[in-house]
Amino acid sequence: MSICLIAEEGADSGALSSLAARWGLVSDPDAVMALVLTAERLELRKQDEPKLGAIFVDFVAGTMAHRRRFGGGRGEAVAKAVGIKKDYLPDVVDATAGLGRDAFVLAALGCRVRMVERNPVVAALLDDGLQRGYRDAEIGPWLQARLTLLHASSMTALRDITPPPDVVYLDPMFPHKQKSALVKKEMRVFQSLVGADDDADALLEPARALAKKRVVVKRPDYAPPLAGVPAQSMLETKSHRFDFYLPA
């Protein structure tokens, strides 16, 4: 995959070369999308829209740390959706990991979560965030035990991953109507990078074949059910819903 690769002052240019080789990235100085290694972290930037800022994964500080400390805990919708109960912490495969937010919330609550991400740039961002998280004194020990990344297509992972999880979680990209700054920024950058999840409908059947307990599909409230298959039950929030499917 071609993308502009930049090592900022203070960053390790050798590390950037190793990263490119690991994820199969080819540097294109003229590319609109840039993967930038700073002294602190790996960032994704849209060079023709610098006001959008940088996208990066940070499990230690910022929004994710705040959500871990002050969020709804087991009362969070995603926790309810995967079926977390007092003595039940499901093993989860998040087959459309993105920036890993929901996966991190579940891991912070005690679930083992295997994230799957097929796009090499997004996988590189996720891995960078994970490695920094693993090194953190506070969250590192449990993060290493509970949250891992597999760089593969969702279809391949759903067919081959072992052992099978209790829950398969799907959150395929869907055009957002909301105009919040965060959604706007991330969706614009992500859709420039990866496009729409045109093959998302094909994930439902293998997900149901893999999951031991349930498949959870996160959808905007206005989106049709995945693959046109009506959910067997659902959990609705203010702007989203979680569609539930039994194994098949």
UniProtKB/Swiss-Prot annotation:
Recorded family membership: Belongs to the methyltransferase superfamily. RsmJ family.
Cytoplasm is among the record's keywords: yes
Gene Ontology terms: cellular component: cytoplasm
Enzyme class, spelled out: transferase
A GO term, aspect molecular function: rRNA (guanine-N2-)-methyltransferase activity
Residue ranges of coiled coil: none
Described function: Specifically methylates the guanosine in position 1516 of 16S rRNA.
Places the protein is found: Cytoplasm
Residues that coordinate or bind S-adenosyl-L-methionine: 101-102, 117-118, 153-154, 171
Species assigned in the record: Pectobacterium carotovorum subsp. carotovorum (strain PC1)
Keywords, comma-separated and alphabetical: Cytoplasm, Methyltransferase, rRNA processing, S-adenosyl-L-methionine, Transferase
Protein name, as recorded: Ribosomal RNA small subunit methyltransferase J
Pfam families (UniProt xref): SAM_MT (PF04445)
Source superkingdom: Bacteria
Entry EC no(s): 2.1.1.242
Primary localisation category: cytoplasm
Reaction equation(s) it catalyzes: guanosine(1516) in 16S rRNA + S-adenosyl-L-methionine = N(2)-methylguanosine(1516) in 16S rRNA + S-adenosyl-L-homocysteine + H(+)
CDD domains the record matches: AdoMet_MTases
InterPro entries according to UniProt: 16SrRNA_methylTrfase_J, SAM-dependent_MTases_sf
